[in-house]
Amino acid sequence: MGVRRSLAALLAALLGCATSLVALTVAASPAHAAPSGNRDVIVHLFQWRWKSIADECRTTLGPHGFGAVQVSPPQEHVVLPAEDYPWWQDYQPVSYKLDQTRRGSRADFIDMVNTCREAGVKIYVDAVINHMTGTGSAGAGPGSAGSSYSKYDYPGIYQSQDFNDCRRDITNWNDKWEVQHCELVGLADLKTSSPYVQDRIAAYLNELIDLGVAGFRIDAAKHIPEGDLQAILSRLKNVHPAWGGGKPYIFQEVIADSTISTGSYTHLGSVTEFQYHRDISHAFANGNIAHLTGLGSGLTPSDKAVVFVVNHDTQRYEPILTHTDRARYDLAQKFMLAHPYGTPKVMSSYTWSGDDKAGPPMHSDGTTRPTDCSADRWLCEHRAVAGMVGFHNAVAGQGIGSAVTDGNGRLAFARGSAGYAAFNATNTAWTRTFTTSLPDGVYCDVANGTFVDGVCDGPSYQVSGGKFTATVPANGAVALHVEAPGSCGPDGCGTPPGGGDDCTTVTARFHATVTTWYGQEVAVVGSIPELGSWQPAQGVRLRTDSGTYPVWSGAVDLPAGVGFEYKYVKLNRTAPWSGSRAATASPPWMTSGGGCSQNFYDSWR
């Protein structure tokens, strides 16, 4: 199958192609509220290098109002070249040293924490404290910082007596004792009931707190008895004064079932709400979102729930809705940021093809490449929803009201008098006059742009008498809030400042994850002459190499403001081309990039 997208225009945020049916020549801004102090949105920069995270905090996360970054495990881990350095090697600790991991050095880690704090962004560490290494890793060589080990022997840290006696895999998941004392997929299960083990784990976490870490995701928390985990957490220090000086924020990975519920751990901190992931993912994947005002009802209490569309496990092993359906995936993440239930965690990851254990873009020695959102296999999904983080912050504490639906795939609602959002999970645009509680004035559409340092780079809409008219893009959204004033040009609202005339051409950068056979090439073709007018031989050839395969990339200059359709084709030596058009879909309106350029990320299996 090919991948085909229908564009109303290249990019609304750059070219002003989202439209309002209200035409204005003069428009006053409302009395907008001061920026909210609420910053609780977490972004999981999965497998990112420490230096790349520091850069992202400074340039993107801080300015857009993200509250925290969940970083990958920072402790020394196994190194598995025979497995092509899989992502999960990082979840097998060899020691609690921070000296060297695939993501950088201790000094790099410290600089990241300090840089992010200066940007107003907390660091939450993914803490692997239930276990050490697994059976398959024994004999693989020293850890990432050079430490020797065997499955039940870690010189200077743990010996055989520090592990539980049930040295076999969990087989009966209905037996709570077995789930918490036997081995998870062959990983050496620590005897967390031991005061010595509790002290060692607490010392590791306290070292991170001393370096400025503000919180922890407790990996595999349900496999640690509640009392043991409470004993460990009771030993923790207070966090940096910049974060209030209290105890660190704790959220625990608890995949609830009939044996162990999320409620078993909420007295220790927040928990990851996996049922939310299933509910929101199915709803947006199926275009059935009209009922979602009540999302979260019957689940973990909102103040204890960390919610997500996908995480690094579910995108591989429970892939209901992922980046491979980018439009609906981005739309679901935007909805999560607009809805009041839970503490949202946005995913940002990388692509892989076929092999779900594949590590991030890396050098030949297995260390991670710097993140480049326009190259390699990095997806940088959080940038596509960055504008909605400000919406989430601005409407904190406001409930849902004035909800309207149009069939199963369209839903709009107010967040009190602080914001209004509309979502369209269908393949056709939705034009409507919406009734809000917003003060009259002009607002920036942060679903299709961002508002940073007083500048709106997306469309604007005028609210008059509490009403505004908008066309919500197919598989898109519109979102307005009181902390993001907009502006209207001489041609009215619905366009970015300047009327979208700043760019005469736009550089379109295509990044397609495509599996090919030897001798095949990949091209992008489309409905305009610059993309070959659907003629494969005239399309734009994409390139790859051993370091970036299966991601094929290429760029072409296109006329600004011109709508087009495109797809990918495989070019063969023995046949002219192969590939077919897929169903029409709308791409994300806001992806990574800036200036007169736009990135397109797609996957074609």
Swiss-Prot record:
Gene3D superfamilies: Glycosidases, Golgi alpha-mannosidase II, Immunoglobulins. This is Alpha-amylase. Residues 500-605 form the CBM20 domain. GO terms for molecular function: alpha-amylase activity; metal ion binding; starch binding. GO terms for biological process: carbohydrate metabolic process. It is an enzyme of class 3 (hydrolase). It catalyses: Endohydrolysis of (1->4)-alpha-D-glucosidic linkages in polysaccharides containing three or more (1->4)-alpha-linked D-glucose units. Belongs to the glycosyl hydrolase 13 family. It comes from Thermomonospora curvata. Its cofactor is Ca(2+). Ca(2+) binds at residues 130, 189, 223. Residues 1-33 form the signal peptide. Keywords: Calcium, Carbohydrate metabolism, Glycosidase, Hydrolase, Metal-binding, Signal.
